[in-house]
């Protein structure tokens, strides 16, 4: 919510502005001294009487219409306060003011007023279509804001920002910057200064009609004589009284406690953020403005008007935000100040919160604009991704804070992506916030009555949270699986480990981060291409939270609770936003890819052709490409996987998974194998066709049993395909290559080794593939007699994890149905007794003999 930077490393325009202020101050002091020394009565300066006799009222000097000529300027730089004609903004007529519709106004009862967030959720389906709304409080504050700031908070002072009162061309040589003044005010001093400016401008101390002041503001900013105003924005503090007798102060609408309410998402943040979780004060004067901006991370905001003159707001609905950014990039900003192209470039400049232009520019390009005139005792709510701007009608004091409820997560994900693309440091750890909210919701679902839960957690908000969490876990599983196929090692990090930021895009790495030999800074999973092209693939270490299996189990539960088709494409108040943002296309593209692949596979089409025919319009769906080979393999072994999944579904979610399924290797890439960049070692891909969870086909699970094969039994794996074929013909001469039956694929697992899309298409490759499967079946049959003995003779090394015992029991239970293969390879002695276990899914887990899964120091 902060609008400008401090005075460290001031830009040239700011320095020029301060020099201009200093020259004007010295000139006025010289004129005052001359007038006081003359024979006649002193002539007061136009900046206002006694204000010049005390340096305390420098604000009056800033806003005065000084008719005295300044010394000629020697600098070639333009005066940052001088008004210029801006042809792109037609201000010759203000008739467009009457075309702006009013936003809705709500009058809650005292009973409804007791639950702020519940009431906001109630009005959101309608109010969010306007971007902003007003709520008139049924309870008034008994202690005025001035008393709170002067009596309850003695010594309260604040600095102001100087705002040039003009329009800008928004070109390289003409922009607007708000900068800090060199003055600290008390609340009373600022009020006196602001009232003097108002009285001098209109010869009145009373409020003027709202429409008249609105017209005056746009005339002044385009043609007027006022150079600049002062605005105290982003001032730490609150004007809500701590008195137990103040009805509003002790209510839930006290903004000091608003973000910490029971159903507020931001209460899960461990560190307070000024302006986001803690409120800030906004103390304004005549024509002080807040420029067009959207809240950080597309959060909700609530603003309470404590006292003073009215305040006019302009709001844009959240679903019209792309149109707003498009208009700004094409009709407000010149190309020379935009870094990049499109709406993201305009969004980057808008984050500076200094862009002010008349709303008629938006109306002319069919972007809806709504208006609110806020009075003392009224709240203004801005909804996620709603751009807004406004100005004050005179001295006033407001207070604002951000908040979020679960239906914010979809747009919060979009904001997180945009910050990463622009390399902006986020204020919130979005991934952590999403995971914590999902875990908390699961506890509520287990321990609360459904009726009482619906009152505290709106069903729509629940669906938004569940959908976003499932999307996050899908992406994590896909990318971790791909890295595991490349040979990356998996380690666990404790829950208490700090949440790191990605060194490339600044996202938070709450669940997973990657370290490699050539880059000792953490990298998040969103940089898959960079990780794949890294020369030290085998030296990459993927660090995963030790409670990853709890999150995976929760994701599977949420998948069963909701239908992603309906939720991702049907957010009630954000349908238009979905059409304009790639975030909402993630699941749609995954879903289309899945359907096309299944249909084409059963009709004989290749997986590559299906991938070409599926839509790929979003850069965010790059991880969907890794699902293509998984789907092809899943279709081949669907029957066996159905049987396996039904047998071991409950066991998979046991602590066993915590030890070996942490990477969720469901994103095996055949393209990598084809290019020689990775190997596909998955020997079992599970597909639950009967499950109501649509993402089961994306999951590659480790086989539920284990078998240690002696070296003598594994010799055949070193033979060439032709040798294997000849031996098979000797053993079973009735088998011929042309007698391959399609149903054979329903009773075998995909063989280990390198695979590619070409192998699925070539008839000769299919024949070799068939014989490899037959060979595996024969090996399995030969091992059946000795399987039980091998199971009993297998000894597990000591470990700090408790899942080994459950692992043995589960293996024995599943031995009748599954004959898995797990290789245990002991590296040379130079590896300091480290054992590498490679599972059937191709994942590599490194453990030390002394401490399995320990977290290495970084």
Curated annotation (Swiss-Prot):
Protein's UniProt name: Lysine-specific demethylase JMJ706
Polar residues bias (residue ranges): 829-844
GO CC, any one term: heterochromatin
Short name of any one Pfam family annotated for the protein: JmjN
Protein's cellular compartments: Nucleus
Cofactor(s) needed by this chain: Fe(2+)
Catalytic activity: N(6),N(6),N(6)-trimethyl-L-lysyl(9)-[histone H3] + 2 2-oxoglutarate + 2 O2 = N(6)-methyl-L-lysyl(9)-[histone H3] + 2 formaldehyde + 2 succinate + 2 CO2
Domain JmjC: 250-420
Chain residue ranges for the region called Disordered: 737-791, 829-858
Key words of the record: Chromatin regulator, Dioxygenase, Iron, Metal-binding, Nucleus, Oxidoreductase, Transcription, Transcription regulation
Compositional bias of kind Basic and acidic residues: 737-746
GO BP annotations, alphabetical order: chromatin remodeling; flower morphogenesis; regulation of gene expression; transcription initiation-coupled chromatin remodeling
């Amino acid at each position: 919510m902060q609008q400008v930077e401090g005075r460290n490393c001031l830009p040239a325009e700011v320095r020029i502005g301060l020099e201009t202020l200093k020259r004007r101050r010295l000139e006025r002091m010289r004129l005052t001294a001359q007038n006081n020394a003359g024979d006649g009565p002193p002539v007061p300066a136009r900046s206002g009487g006694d204000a010049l006799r005390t340096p305390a009222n420098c604000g009056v000097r800033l806003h005065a219409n000084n008719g005295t000529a300044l010394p000629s300027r020697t600098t070639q730089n333009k005066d940052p306060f001088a008004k210029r004609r801006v042809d792109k903004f037609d201000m010759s007529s203000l008739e467009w003011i009457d075309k702006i519709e009013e936003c809705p106004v709500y009058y809650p009862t005292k009973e409804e007023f007791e639950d702020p967030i519940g009431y906001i959720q109630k009005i959101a389906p309608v109010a969010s279509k306007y971007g902003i709304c007003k709520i008139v409080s049924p309870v008034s504050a008994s202690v005025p804001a001035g008393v709170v700031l002067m009596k309850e908070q003695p010594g309260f002072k604040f600095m102001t920002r100087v705002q040039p009162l003009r329009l800008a061309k928004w070109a390289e040589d003409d922009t607007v910057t708000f900068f800090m003044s060199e003055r600290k005010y008390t609340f009373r001093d600022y009020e006196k200064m602001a009232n003097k400016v108002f009285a001098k401008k209109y010869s009145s101390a009373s409020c003027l009609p709202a429409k008249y002041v609105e017209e005056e503001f746009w005339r002044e900013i385009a043609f007027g004589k006022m150079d600049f105003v002062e605005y105290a924005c982003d001032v730490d503090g609150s004007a809500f009284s701590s008195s137990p007798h103040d009805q509003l102060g002790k209510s839930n609408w006290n903004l000091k406690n608003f973000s910490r309410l029971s159903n507020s998402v931001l209460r899960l943040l461990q560190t307070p953020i000024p302006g986001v979780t803690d409120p800030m004060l906004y103390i304004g004067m005549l024509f002080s403005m807040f420029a067009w901006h959207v809240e950080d991370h597309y959060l909700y905001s609530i603003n309470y008007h404590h006292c003073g003159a009215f305040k006019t707001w302009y709001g844009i609905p959240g679903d019209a935000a792309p149109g707003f950014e498009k208009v700004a990039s094409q009709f407000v900003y010149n190309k020379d100040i935009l870094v990049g192209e499109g709406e993201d470039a305009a969004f980057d400049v808008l984050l500076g919160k200094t862009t002010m232009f008349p709303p008629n520019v938006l109306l002319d390009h069919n972007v809806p604009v709504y208006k609110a005139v806020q009075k003392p005792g009224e709240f203004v709510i801005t909804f996620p991704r709603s751009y807004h701007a406004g100005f004050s009608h005179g001295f006033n004091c407001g207070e604002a804070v951000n908040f979020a409820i679960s239906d914010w997560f979809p747009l919060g994900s979009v904001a997180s992506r945009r910050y990463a693309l622009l390399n902006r440091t986020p204020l919130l750890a979005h991934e952590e916030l999403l995971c914590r909210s999902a875990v908390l919701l699961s506890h509520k679902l287990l321990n609360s009555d459904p009726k009482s839960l619906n009152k505290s957690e709106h069903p729509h908000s629940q669906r938004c949270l569940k959908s976003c969490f499932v999307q996050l876990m899908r992406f994590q599983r896909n990318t971790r699986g791909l890295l595991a196929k490349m040979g990356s090692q998996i380690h666990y990090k404790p829950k208490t480990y700090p949440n790191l930021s990605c060194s490339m895009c600044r996202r938070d790495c709450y669940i997973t981060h990657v370290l490699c030999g050539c880059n000792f800074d953490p990298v998040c999973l969103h940089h898959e291409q960079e990780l794949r092209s890294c020369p030290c693939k085998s030296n990459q270490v993927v660090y995963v939270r030790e409670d990853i299996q709890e999150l995976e189990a929760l994701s599977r539960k949420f998948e069963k609770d909701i239908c992603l088709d309906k939720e991702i494409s049907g957010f009630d108040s954000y349908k238009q936003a979905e059409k304009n943002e790639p975030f909402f296309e993630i699941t749609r593209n995954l879903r289309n890819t899945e359907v096309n692949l299944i249909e084409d596979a059963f009709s004989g089409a290749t997986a590559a052709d299906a991938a070409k025919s599926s839509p790929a319009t979003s850069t965010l769906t790059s991880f969907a490409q890794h699902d293509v080979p998984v789907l092809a393999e899943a279709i081949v072994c669907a029957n066996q996987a159905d049987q396996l999944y039904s047998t071991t579904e409950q066991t998979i979610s046991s602590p066993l998974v915590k030890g070996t399924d942490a990477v969720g290797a469901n994103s095996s890439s055949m393209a990598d194998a084809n290019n020689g960049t990775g190997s596909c070692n998955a020997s079992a891909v599970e597909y639950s066709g009967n499950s109501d969870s649509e993402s089961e086909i994306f999951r590659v699970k480790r086989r539920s049993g284990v078998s240690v094969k002696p070296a003598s039994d594994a010799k055949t794996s070193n033979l060439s395909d032709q040798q294997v074929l000849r031996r098979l013909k000797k053993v079973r001469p009735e088998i011929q290559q042309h007698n391959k039956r399609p149903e054979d694929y329903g009773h075998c697992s995909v063989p280990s080794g390198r695979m590619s899309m070409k192998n699925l298409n070539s008839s000769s490759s299919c024949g070799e593939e068939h014989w490899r499967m037959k060979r595996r079946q024969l090996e399995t049959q030969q091992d059946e007699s000795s399987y039980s003995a091998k199971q009993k003779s297998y000894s597990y090394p000591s470990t700090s994890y408790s899942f080994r015992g459950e692992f043995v029991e589960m293996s024995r239970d599943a031995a009748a149905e599954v004959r898995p293969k797990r290789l245990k390879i002991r590296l040379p002695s130079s590896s300091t007794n480290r054992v590498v276990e490679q599972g059937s899914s191709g994942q590599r887990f490194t453990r030390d003999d002394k401490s399995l899964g320990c977290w290495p120091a970084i």
